[in-house]
Amino acid sequence: TITDLIDPFYCKLLEVESRAQTTPLGKLRRQIRQDCEQAAEMPPGFFSLTVPTGGGKTLSSLAFALNHSRRFQLRRVLYVLPFTTIIEQNAAVFRRFLGNDAVLEHHSNLDPNVETQAARLAAENWDSPLIVTTSVQFYESIFASRPAACRKLHRLARSVIILDEAQTLPVEYLAPCLQAIKELVNNYGCTVVLCTATQP
């Protein structure tokens, strides 16, 4: 379950922070993470996280998601990114902190010849505590009328959905996408975090 990931996450985080605790950047990252942990106690709904580049947004948003999931018994975390290059990078960070089995990548760069049948099925159903996927895959799971795309829709209920670099959504899709995430928050028990990085 998602709450089983909290101890491994903090074990690895303390190890990483102990090496950087005296640097100004290390102190800033720790403060941002602690602010996110405090926000995780607030009731499910919409949240925003704007952090300067290099400020630890990825791990801070994950700390929020894990703590919020535990506090409100949410079932999984979806980390939604606009580009496959940063998906692979973020998934590698998550695996380093949570282990390989806890993280599911789902995007177009995955090689179906390398993936096992179990991995393909997990990707089709989003059957994992932490799913890292593209905006395209995420919104297709909501809007598509194909059974294969809709198969993972039920996995969105009672989840923390982190929309990283949310401002990259094309303007012409903004209204329906915002309506969809409002629906997820209002009627599916989701929490949505809109993340962006500001330039330092």
Where are these regions (language model features)?
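N-terminal helicase ATP-binding lobe
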Residues: T1-P200
